[in-house]
Amino acid sequence: VSASDVSNNNTPIDFMSDLNEVYEKFKDGSISIRGHKSMKFINKIPFNIVTENANKLYSTRQGKYGALNPKCFDQTYHIDEYNPLVINNVYNENSYKIIKDYFHSNIDCGNFALGDRQANRYKSNNESFSRLVQYELLPLVEHVLNKKMQPTYIYVSCYTKNQEKDGEERKTELPPHTDRPDCEYTISYIIDKPEGSNWPIYVDKTKQPVKNKGRYWFYPPKENCIPVDGDANSLMMFNGTDHIHYREEMPCDFYYIVLLHFRSVET
């Protein structure tokens, strides 16, 4: 999302209004496969499947809370660069079932591509349905941070167990890196994982002198890192622009997340 997508003539964009318009366009069949207003899509899934699930998700919304679990708003939260945050049971029960089933079914039938340069995962950038999930989360992100935020982009990162590629085993891990500017706040939403499994992301306590550097070729010692993990239907939130973070080799069969990125609204 560029600056021009976020504001026009210094008029702040109402992202929740855009979300409601997108739902209406899904309902009446007028939605573009490229999205609408601030919500841009890069569509990879058959659009009839996206439309069906967008309409299902809309039907589970609960007033001002949308698809979110209202109980998440019953408390205040603290997060800073040395204190990552985990919130469980983020979406209401009916919304969560639709989200979980959407990713499982589309992975199982081959609609998501497998593998990228970084990890052994099913991937997609700004996938249509995931953008709805991201916009639905915005009120909770603003509640947590107590400031206006804007959704930037999403990346589907549904990790799967090691597979052989060209005769070599490919490890399922996440190399050490820092995030780019549009990831001011990195939110890993855990779609699903095997019950009882644990695969933490390690966030280095050391602040890097240069932000947004990207890939690093060393692993910070674990004793200097904060391990972060949550349950299925939870979010993990931290600032990864100048703190290296990584995952070790995955011990479970799968770990499905979608990365939902946000940044502060410029004033």
PLM-predicted stretches and their roles:
Residues L145-Y155:
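A short coil-to-beta-strand element that immediately follows conserved catalytic motifs
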Residues Y246-C252:
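Short proline/glycine-enriched turn/loop segments at secondary-structure junctions
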Residues S2-L145:
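Non-heme Fe(II)/2-oxoglutarate
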Residues E136-L140, Y155, T186:
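Generic beta-strand or strand-like secondary-structure segments
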Residues V86-N88, Q150-P151, M237-F238, L259:
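A structural signal for short, well-ordered beta-strand segments and their strand-loop junctions
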Residues K161-D242, F254-V258, S264-T267:
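Catalytic core of non-heme Fe(II) oxygenases with the double-stranded beta-helix
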Residues N89, G240, E249, F262:
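Active-site donor-binding loop signature of nucleotide-sugar glycosyltransferases
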